[in-house]
Amino acid sequence: MGVKLEIFRMIIYLTFPVAMFWVSNQAEWFEDDVIQRKRELWPPEKLQEIEEFKERLRKRREEKLLRDAQQNS
């Protein structure tokens, strides 16, 4: 009885992670459940806001480079 129980436990220990990886790597499941849930919780930002943010970052970077160049010369 003890050996059979240990074999059963080992099969469960090995099968469960493999099954979880198999389920989570299904593209349809991932798209349907995970991506949709993410979009519900955090809707995508507006494209214009993202572009404005990138422009502000670019301007800051350029200003910093100009200041550094002026200090070094």
Swiss-Prot record:
Q: Where in the cell is it found?
A: Membrane; Mitochondrion; Mitochondrion inner membrane
Give TM segment ranges.
7-24
UniProt KW keywords: Disease variant, Membrane, Mitochondrion, Mitochondrion inner membrane, Primary mitochondrial disease, Transit peptide, Transmembrane, Transmembrane helix
Quaternary structure and partners: Interacts with COX7A2.
Check the record and name the InterPro entries matching this protein: Pet100
> An example Gene Ontology cellular component term from the record?
mitochondrion
- What GO biological process terms does the UniProt entry carry, in alphabetical order? mitochondrial cytochrome c oxidase assembly
- Taxon lineage: Eukaryota, Metazoa, Chordata, Craniata, Vertebrata
- Presence of the UniProt keyword Transmembrane helix in the record: yes
Classification via PANTHER family: PROTEIN PET100 HOMOLOG, MITOCHONDRIAL (PTHR33968:SF1)
The family assignment reads:
Belongs to the PET100 family.
Concerning Pfam families, the annotation shows:
Pet100
The protein's name in its UniProt record: Protein PET100 homolog, mitochondrial
The species is: Homo sapiens
The disease tied to this protein in UniProt is: Mitochondrial complex IV deficiency, nuclear type 12: An autosomal recessive mitochondrial disorder with onset in early infancy. MC4DN12 features include poor overall growth, metabolic acidosis, profoundly delayed psychomotor development, seizures, hypotonia, and brain abnormalities. Death may occur in the first years of life. Serum lactate and creatine kinase levels are increased. Patient tissues show decreased levels and activity of mitochondrial respiratory complex IV.
Which membrane topology term applies here? Single-pass membrane protein
Q: What does this protein do?
A: Plays an essential role in mitochondrial complex IV maturation and assembly.
Q: Which GO terms describe its molecular function?
A: unfolded protein binding
